[in-house]
Amino acid sequence: MFHMIAYASMRTDIPAFYSDWLVRRIEEGFVMVRSPYNDHLIYKLPFNPEVIDCLGFCTKDPGEMIPHLDALKNWKTLWHVTITPYGKEYEPGVRDKRDIISAFKNLSLRVGKDRVVWRYDPVFLSPLFSISSHKIWFSTLSSLLEGYTDRVIFSFLDIYPFLKDNMQRLGIRAPEKSEMEELALFFVEEGRKHGLIVSSCAEGHWMKDFGIDTSGCLTKDVWEKCAERKLNFPNKKGKRGECNCILGFDIGGYGGCGMKCVYCYGRNYDRNEVHNPLSPLLFGWPRKEDEIKDVKAESWADKDGWLI
């Protein structure tokens, strides 16, 4: 049995670029996902709030989804919205940050600030962004988002091997340990001024003594708060050693993200030409040689375990 938490998506920005497709999947009540490990294996997952306990979103721009929020009125949702200080030189496809902040606030007013989390990541240093720059921007954004969320998550840049040459060309580097400590201490102190719980993502637990929540950004407690129910997870341990996060069933696919961030691990090759909002798959259509595997789906909600 697969996770009855669905995630849209760590692989590409579905809310920003594929909202019409997502709404159609909701209307038809199922979604297909091609395995990233086997190109001829497709999982078919029931896609309705009776079996999906929580639907998580990860996006740099929730604006395109706001007109579709009525389609999600019966769903329990959690939104991670990334707002960084970086400009077009690093995030060429991201709209003006003032528009993103406006969309963040609008989303918060519609779904509730407890369901919208601000992500300030990845944190890196470059000729354009110093320690001081991050302090100024984090303080500014914390002030602008005050009252619209109660949590901020940050992480430091991980440089994947296939990105190393590009990072060196742009002068981008991960902070040194002492620089991480300086920023982490500033983030937690500044965040508290604006009513924010400050959490780290997959950074281990070395910042716990700073007052930072290092448990993880998608833990059992987080998902239960989203579902408003106790959830009977088949495996209560997370998959990553750095945190206790429980990752949902990702309905996205790699490629096709128009943000084209220079630091992204999702590889920015263009798959828009194979996207069709009528297809049950995000990219392409099922092929005759594909194996389609029906996912056994059942809600994990404890029928007597209401949290509210």
Question: Residue spans of the language-model regions?
Answer:
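N-terminal [4Fe-4S]-dependent radical SAM core
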Residues: 1-7, 15, 48, 211-254, ...
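Surface-exposed cleft-lining segments at the edges of enzyme active sites
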Residues: 86-94, 122-132, 167-175
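Conserved C-terminal portion of the radical SAM core fold
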Residues: 99-166, 186-202
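A conserved mid-domain beta-alpha-beta active-site/ligand-binding segment of alpha/beta enzyme cores
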Residues: 162-249
